[in-house]
């Protein structure tokens, strides 16, 4: 059952959807999903469908939209606001995080930042980076990345539309060493899913994330697939569902 919600975030209203689990026992646990750069909570409909499937009989799911193209510091603050809302209103026994791409970096920083209130029981990193610099040079291009470091606004025109992003988006990235944060993940289940042919966040970054993290960890490469897992999204979703069932 889907329920829309809106909360007061640190930089304005945050809107999202709760999939309240169809099984009463499943409502004791919540998966919070964080989308990627220039993405949305619906994920072209696929993330919404996965949330529906998980919410049927595994656990409740919360997904939401970050402020558009906001920098990592702001995304971390917004994810914390959503987690506060989840803990206060849903009172779950276990909270899980699932971060796609840049949302994965947001989850790592939030989960491993040393605040117990924001540390989940388990975490899924879906096409998530290990090096923000390497990743955003690939995403933006070397020239645009370097120009942003010198204060020039980032202008993107592509199939996703026209976006003008403040240069502080790039300079803010240098405040966060994702790898150093992830080294603090010492216990708890961790599932890493990554496309074998990902050219946006290279597959070696998933391997590095797997090697430096602790806990009960699992790395699954999606054979022949890209950053968005266009070929094997359904298979990746089944991995997430199976992993949740084992850890609830």
Which residues does each PLM region occupy?
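N-terminal cap/lid segment of alpha/beta-hydrolase-fold proteins
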Residues: 1-26
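The alpha/beta-hydrolase serine catalytic core
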Residues: 4, 10, 14, 96, ...
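Short, surface-exposed "cap/lid" segments of acyl-processing enzymes
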Residues: 13, 23-68
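Glycine-rich His-Gly loop
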Residues: 33-37, 101, 195
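Short, surface-exposed alpha-helical segments at coil->helix boundaries
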Residues: 44, 48, 73-76, 203-207
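Aromatic pocket-lining residues of Rossmann-like dinucleotide-binding sites
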Residues: 54, 110-114
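Catalytic nucleophile-loop/oxyanion-hole region of alpha/beta-hydrolase
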Residues: 62-94
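Glycine-rich nucleophile elbow surrounding the catalytic serine of serine-hydrolase chemistry
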Residues: 99-109
């Amino acid at each position: 059952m889907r329920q829309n919600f809106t909360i007061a975030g640190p930089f304005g209203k945050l809107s999202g959807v709760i999939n309240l689990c169809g099984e009463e026992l499943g409502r004791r646990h919540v998966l919070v999903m964080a989308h990627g750069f220039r993405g949305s909570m619906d994920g072209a409909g696929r993330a919404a469908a996965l949330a529906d499937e998980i919410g049927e009989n595994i656990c409740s799911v919360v997904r939401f939209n970050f402020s558009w193209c906001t920098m990592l510091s702001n995304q971390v603050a917004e994810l914390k606001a959503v987690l506060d809302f989840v803990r206060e209103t849903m009172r779950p026994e276990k909270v899980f995080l699932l971060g796609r791409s840049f949302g994965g970096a947001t989850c790592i920083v939030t989960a491993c930042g040393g605040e117990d209130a924001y540390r989940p029981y388990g975490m899924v990193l879906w096409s998530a980076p290990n090096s923000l610099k390497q990743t955003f040079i690939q995403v933006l291009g070397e020239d645009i990345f370097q120009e942003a470091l010198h204060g020039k606004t980032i202008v993107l025109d592509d199939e996703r539309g026209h976006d003008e992003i403040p240069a502080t988006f790039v300079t803010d990235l240098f405040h966060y060493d994702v790898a150093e944060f992830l080294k603090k993940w010492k216990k708890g289940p961790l599932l890493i899913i990554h496309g074998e042919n990902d050219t946006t966040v290279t597959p070696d970054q998933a391997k590095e994330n797997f090697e430096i993290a602790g806990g009960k960890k699992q790395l699954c490469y999606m054979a022949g697939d890209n950053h968005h897992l266009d070929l094997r999204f359904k298979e990746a979703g089944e991995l997430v569902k199976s992993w949740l069932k084992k850890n609830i």
